[in-house]
Amino acid sequence: MKFAYNKLYWDKYHEKVSVKINPLKNPSLLLTGSSGAGKSYSLKWLLLNLLVEQKVNLWFCNYKDSCDFKFLKLHEKYYTGEACEEGFQKFYEYFLEMQKKSEDSITQMSILIFDEYPAFILRQQNEDKKKAEKYTRMLADILMFFRSYKGGCWIICQRADSQYFSSSRENFHNRILLTRGRPSKESLQMLGFTKDDLLDTKYNVGEGIAYVDGQGLFQIK
């Protein structure tokens, strides 16, 4: 599926050259960027590209009830606000059920998209630390093991602080940092990037850097 466009080709030749991924091999995504960097538009574009190529059992947790995803409100596995707890739990239970099946018997992908996951975890940490730890472990299990059963998780957030992910950030098969101007050293480190990975030019809305497992680093737009 189309994952992004290569910024280097666009800047030099004004040619759209796609960065492509196999979502069955790389099903999980960490999409980060400050407010106004283009995350919502990018997410909708990525979701469209996925659905064009794959039959997907889609779960969507819109924690802050963003109007960008209201078009999904009639979808049976669409959750907002506090109901995201239910959605996350049900997806995890589904993941456990899939583990009981043979890999060859699974005919479609299963993806959980969780918008503003850190805000969700932060609230849990403030109200019930044990519950927050449970959800953090659930995410780690999904990222570590669900790929074998055609499943994964897309997390969308402004900052990928380690307190929200424990050690599971490294298990995202695809990582995107969208940035306007020049990203901070801290925001780069959160996704495993360094300043040496950046171009000399500033980045515009919808542009940034990405890592694809098995392919490496890309400058994207």
Where are these regions (language model features)?
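Mechanochemical coupling/switch segment within NTP-driven translocation systems
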Residues: N57-C61, D68-F114
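Conserved P-loop NTPase "ATPase switch" module shared by AAA+ and STAND
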Residues: E103-A132
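N-terminal pre-Walker A segment at the start of P-loop NTPase domains
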Residues: M1-S18
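Conserved lysine of the Walker
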Residues: K39
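Hydrophobic positions on the alpha1 helix immediately C-terminal to the Walker A/P-loop
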Residues: S42, L46
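Substrate-engagement module of ASCE P-loop NTPases
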Residues: G87-Q99, K131-I155, G181
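Conserved ATP-driven motor cores of ASCE-family P-loop NTPases powering translocation/secretion/packaging/pilus
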Residues: C157-K221
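Loop/turn-to-beta-strand initiation segments
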Residues: K55-N57, T107-I111, F146-I155
